[in-house]
Amino acid sequence: MTAQDQSLAKSFEPAAIEAKWGPEWEKRGIAQPTFDPAKPDFAIQLPPPNVTGTLHMGHAFNQTIMDGLTRHARMLGANTLWVPGTDHAGIATQIVVERQLEAQGVSRHDLGREKFTEKVWAWKEESGSTITRQVRRMGASIDWTREYFTMSPDMSKAVTEVFVRLHEQGLIYRGKRLVNWDPVLGTAVSDLEVDSVEEDGFLWHIRYPLVEADAKGGLTHLTVATTRPETMLGDVAVMVHPEDERYAHLIGKEVELPLTGRRIPVIADEYVDREFGTGVVKVTPAHDFNDYAVGQRHNLPQISILTLDAKITADAPGNYAGQDRYDARKAIVADLEAQGLLVETKKHKLMTPRSERTGSAIEPMLTDQWFVAMSKPAPEGTFYPGRSIAEVALDAVQSGEIKLVPENWNSTYNQWLANIQDWCISRQLWWGHQIPAWYDDAGNCFVARTEEEAQAKAKAAGSTGALRREEDVLDTWFSSALVPFSSLGWPEETPELKHFLPSSVLVTGYDIIFFWVARMVMMTKHFTGQVPFHTVYVHGLVRDSEGKKMSKSEGNTLDPVDLIDGIDLDTLLKKRTTGLRRPKDAPKIEKKTKKEFPEGIPAFGADALRFTFASLATLGRNINFDTGRCEGYRNFCNKLWNATRFVLMNTEGHDCGMGPCNNDCGPDGYLHFSQADRWIVSLLQRVEADVEKGFAEYRFDNIASAIYKFVWDEYCDWYLELAKVQIQTGTEAQQRATRRTLLRVLETVLRLAHPIIPFITEELWQKVAPLAGRAKGDGTESLALQAYPLPAMAKIDEAAEQWVAQLKAVVDACRNLRGEMNISPAQRIPLYAQGDTEFLREASAHIQALAKLSEVRVFEDDATLQAEGAGAPVAIVGGNHLLLKIEIDVAAERVRLSKEIERIGGEIGKCRGKLSNESFVAKAPPAVVAQETQRLSDFEQTLAKLQDQLQRLPA
């Protein structure tokens, strides 16, 4: 491929450019790192998406930021590595395959573990490349030769090694603890996989009779309020606040537990909220996390009354055994009422923990699980003996070894680690890293790297029978926590580990600081003695344009690929209404979609989408995504494309001043730079400084804004117009200088914008760089590997900046006068000017062209100006008096202006009437009131201008 194989197309067509450059970059290996010891190292980890998932807006936003940082570092000359990978995503992937089997009338239990796992592997191979193809569509400059999968042999080896070492160090153990249990999936789940959903429920008030009469208070019973009467079968106490005078004398007494025949004690604990319900709370340690903690403090027994599929256990009292939890609830409430123990039932709003995957209500359940000890001191022989892994991870941030951006996340991170519980790492699934533990017939456990090693350990312990493998698998987050070092070849010593650990920065949403970020710090510090990364850039979450969370059930999700390629309405509707958890939501979603996208979504291209994400990337805040902004940045790409076409048309085949003379050689020399040339170069230095500051501070919104404003507002809207004048009217030396400036500034802009909009900049650079003397022109070079622009502050020219500022003010004043006098843009009229004579004469050609004037006459004194331009509309800009010499019918113009002033006055009266109406202000939506306030302000400004024009008319 050569850069000059065809001229630049007339219009910007992102699909063709993306299809060309994505594969080309990969073929050229631009993302593959060097290992040059003389260069700085830059590494970044891609948060591994689910292998069977698809790209969502959060991924696309996150990858835009990461790619921007990576391309920037590469262009600064660093040894650069962006490590890609996919996660086996235990629960998510298993659910997908189970649903496929369910549609065929088969369950995983029908197949058995081995055949089911084969099915999952087959599904992974079939669909696992979807998300990596989509990541490529975003233009991510990833070294795909290093792509890992968290269950590949190398990664599995690292996982096993970590588990075995932690167990040998006494930091992994098996025990019975309370966990989040999904009864549909039949497994423990992490907090991240649990949604708290506000629901309508009930608060049942139940009598618990006192065993002994209350002689002091005259009470016969205590009334307990609960939202879960079915769990009372597992109550082991009732508790009151120790300072609650109503019940203090009953502490240590007993009550009858209704429907069971058991007696349970009255205990005191400060956990009780005296204001909630009656101030008496039931304690069920086996089925409530808070009660579990109370039970630990008071050494209470634990009675499990639910099976793993959420049915009442076989040894439960009464006829409740075997009933579903909700059926048992109804039966228990009915029996309580029949026995006169139900005081009242009140409607109550409650937060129900529901499984993110199945929607089932989560049960706190006592089960045997594997845990990593968070607070236990590490033994001798580790990097930090005597200190817990949580303590070491906490110190990494507190000491400044790891920097969180923005800093306000430090307190959140610190608070979580300071109050951390042991980490439940086992899951009752079939897909995942099977825990490397084996049991003999007596239940003795042998943790080992292989079955052979386990048998050797068993034999050494005197156990000679067959061993049974632990069926549980590891939490997906366990293997994810190792990727900073496992993806670089650990436990082997590799060049990658030497160069790229710690990585430079981690880019992540705030929602997984605890689940992933903190655990990576723990594991990496414990096993390598190093932090996993120097900086964590914490960004907000992508929401819809109204700030609502994007979810399929709300019908407000957007597929990044649909924004890149476009999608018609029918396909979009089908996509949004298929596979809903609640199919009844489909009509609502269809209506919302038709309103928002009546003609579907147009193709914006990857660059416009990336620019939109960058512009929204404020520190720490959520991102309200609006497709209207995509349209604006697609327009920006068009503007940049058309500007490049203009530059090429005015430079190809011309002497563009790329000879040996780089500096201004004067009017009679080879190059003679105009004020405008020096101004745009000066301004470019300031923009380069702003962009570099933006990268240093992770302010991609500022980077996007600086580039946008410079390209659109300065280079395109002003400099290109000024350059036209200079090329048409300047000397040969001036023309060469202007052509050189056009090319050099544009080429620099393309390098500057490349980390944000890589496709269009690469395509344009291939055409511009050879003319600018920055490339050979044979197509072998890539913009991705060019030097990133850095400011040369010596090139800042404040005099040129002031000169152009004065020019802009004069041109704007002329344009405003034309608008106020309703002069057609096609009508060329003369400008009479007096003031800074030297400036006005030097700038006259530019003023004439940009303000669409027939001529610019400069007068030496104001008296002559007024005499020559009597009755003409006047503007004063700085020290310059400007008159547009036009003939107008003064009487007719006076009538027209008077009528318009009267009309605008009427509109102002209507607006003021509305805004003074208290009922309107109170009842109308805030947006409507704000709109009316803005209308009033606009009308008042228009009125002031009209009155000013009327006063200017000659008598």
UniProtKB/Swiss-Prot annotation:
Question: Annotated motif 'HIGH' region: location in the chain?
Answer: 49-59
The protein's GO terms of the molecular function aspect are: aminoacyl-tRNA deacylase activity; ATP binding; valine-tRNA ligase activity
Q: Respond yes or no to whether keyword Nucleotidyltransferase is given for this record.
A: no
User: Kind of enzyme, top EC level?
Assistant: ligase
Task: Give the residue ranges of motif 'KMSKS' region.
Answer: 549-553
- Which InterPro entries does the UniProt record give? aa-tRNA-synth_I_CS (IPR001412), aa-tRNA-synth_Ia (IPR002300), Anticodon_Ia_Val (IPR033705), M/V/L/I-tRNA-synth_anticd-bd (IPR013155), Rossmann-like_a/b/a_fold (IPR014729), tRNA-bd_arm (IPR010978), tRNAsynth_Ia_anticodon-bd (IPR009080), Val-tRNA_synth_C_sf (IPR037118)
Q: Which residues form a coiled coil?
A: 926-955
Q: Which UniProt keywords apply?
A: Aminoacyl-tRNA synthetase, ATP-binding, Coiled coil, Cytoplasm, Ligase, Nucleotide-binding, Protein biosynthesis
Q: Which GO terms describe its cellular component?
A: cytosol
Q: Which GO terms describe its biological process?
A: valyl-tRNA aminoacylation
Listed EC numbers: 6.1.1.9
Record flagged with keyword Protein biosynthesis:
yes
Q: Which Gene3D superfamilies match?
A: HUPs, Isoleucyl-tRNA Synthetase, Domain 1, Valyl-tRNA synthetase, C-terminal domain, Valyl/Leucyl/Isoleucyl-tRNA synthetase, editing domain
| Superkingdom of the organism of origin | Bacteria
PROSITE patterns documented for this protein = AA_TRNA_LIGASE_I
Where does this polypeptide localize?
A: Cytoplasm
Where does this protein hold ATP?
K552
Matching entries from SUPFAM superfamilies are given as: Anticodon-binding domain of a subclass of class I aminoacyl-tRNA synthetases, Nucleotidylyl transferase, tRNA-binding arm, ValRS/IleRS/LeuRS editing domain
Assembly and binders: Monomer.
The UniProt entry's sequence similarity note says: Belongs to the class-I aminoacyl-tRNA synthetase family. ValS type 1 subfamily.
Biological role stated in the UniProt entry: Catalyzes the attachment of valine to tRNA(Val). As ValRS can inadvertently accommodate and process structurally similar amino acids such as threonine, to avoid such errors, it has a 'posttransfer' editing activity that hydrolyzes mischarged Thr-tRNA(Val) in a tRNA-dependent manner.
UniProt comment concerning the protein's domains: ValRS has two distinct active sites: one for aminoacylation and one for editing. The misactivated threonine is translocated from the active site to the editing site.
**Name of the featured protein:** Valine--tRNA ligase
Q: Native species of this protein?
A: Cupriavidus pinatubonensis (strain JMP 134 / LMG 1197) (Cupriavidus necator (strain JMP 134))
Gene field: valS
